[in-house]
Every structure is written in C-alpha cells, then in structure tokens.
C-alpha cells in the first residue's frame, strides 16, 4: 500500500512540476528499464533536455550502505530496510539498464559519480562511460576507505546484535544469520580485520 501511494504521489508531483517547466532531478535504482525510459521520453516530449547521471559503487559497499542507512535512519524513525535479494537484483540489472539508456541517444550527456564526486562525463562515448563504470564498481579500496568500511560493518554488526536481543530474526525478509555471513564474506574479500 505504501509503495503504491508514494509512487502515485511522486508521479503526480512530477507531472505537475514538469507541466510548469521546473528543472527536475529524478532518481531511481534502474531496477527496471521501463520507468526511466518512459519518464525521459515524456519529459523530452515536453521540451526538456535530459542528462544521465549514475553513481558507481562496488556491490559489497552498496549493500553495507543499505544496512548502515537503515540502522541510522531507524534511530530517527525513518529507517527503510532493503531485502538483500532486491539489492542484488538491482546491482545485477544496473549495468545492463545503464548501458541501454546510455546507448538510447535520449541524453545530452552522461555523468558518472562516486559517492564523493563526479569522475567521468561524456556526450557520446557509451563504451568509455561503461568501461569507467565497470572499473569503479570493481575497484580495490585504499587504506582509508577500507577503514571506513570496517567501521560501518562494525556498526551494522552491533545493530544486528541489538535486533537479535529484541527477538528479531530478519531484516526486510533477509535472515540476520544470512546478513552476518555476507558481512563476514565482505570482510574477508576486502581483507578487513587482517593485515592490509
């Protein structure tokens, strides 16, 4: 019910603001190709020019980020949990959908960002855009980034322990035991807690 309601409200606000020719920034996960494609075509029909911006984050860091955001938000009453299967589906589909959108010719320019800054932009070079995207999502972490990730994982571990003390066994349908296994796998693959 909440998803349908928020989607309807978002659609209504977008229509109203685009009819009034406001500058718009629309965000989404690119879980499907249909939604960003449809919205871009609608806005171009109304006379808008469009830019494609994507944030490239390694999958493991992204997943830890969803947990971190959930637990931080929960303390403020705004926590929104993400099922790991949904996260992994989005991570799997993102490169495919991003490339299709980039190749569509609908965008004046394409921009690639990390969570910190823009790292690449182009008007037409889809292959270079996608190569840079792949490099970023597959990158190794430097020492400081590894330490930040370790702190986030420790925070999530503590929050999971608190949830277990309260009798919860899952976060957004993902069993806490599965989340813990994933966090351990991330620590191992990133050499966190080991000599770096």
Residue ranges of model-derived segments:
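Generic recognition of well-structured, leucine-rich alpha-helical segments
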Residues: 20-21, 57, 69, 73
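Conserved nucleotide-sensing/catalytic segment adjacent to the nucleotide-binding pocket
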Residues: 1-42
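Short acidic DE-rich linear segments
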Residues: 190-196
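Flexible loop/turn segments at secondary-structure boundaries
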Residues: 33-34, 60, 118-120
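A generic structural signal for alpha->beta connector loops
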Residues: 21, 47-49, 106-109
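Conserved phosphate-donor/acceptor-positioning beta-strand/loop module used by diverse small-molecule
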Residues: 31, 44-67
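Conserved GTP-binding G-domain of TRAFAC-class P-loop NTPases and closely related GTPase folds
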Residues: 64-187
């Amino acid at each position: 019910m909440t998803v349908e309601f928020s989607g309807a409200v978002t659609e209504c606000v977008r229509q109203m603001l685009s009819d009034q020719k406001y500058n718009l920034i629309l965000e989404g996960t690119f879980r499907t190709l249909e939604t960003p494609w449809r919205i871009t075509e609608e806005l171009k029909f109304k006379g808008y020019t469009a830019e494609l911006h994507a944030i490239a984050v390694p999958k493991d860091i992204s997943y830890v980020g969803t947990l971190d955001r959930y637990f931080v938000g929960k303390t403020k009453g705004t926590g929104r949990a993400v099922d790991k299967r949904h996260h992994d589906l989005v991570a799997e589909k993102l490169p495919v959908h991003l490339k299709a959108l980039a190749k569509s010719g609908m965008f004046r320019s394409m921009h690639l960002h990390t969570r910190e800054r823009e790292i690449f932009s182009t008007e037409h070079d889809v292959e270079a855009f996608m190569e840079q995207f792949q490099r970023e999502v597959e990158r190794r972490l430097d020492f400081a980034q590894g330490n930040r990730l370790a702190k986030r994982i420790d925070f999530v571990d503590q929050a999971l322990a608190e949830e277990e003390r309260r009798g919860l066994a899952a976060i957004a349908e993902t069993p806490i035991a599965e989340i813990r296994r994933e966090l351990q796998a991330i620590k191992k693959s990133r050499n966190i807690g080991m000599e770096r």
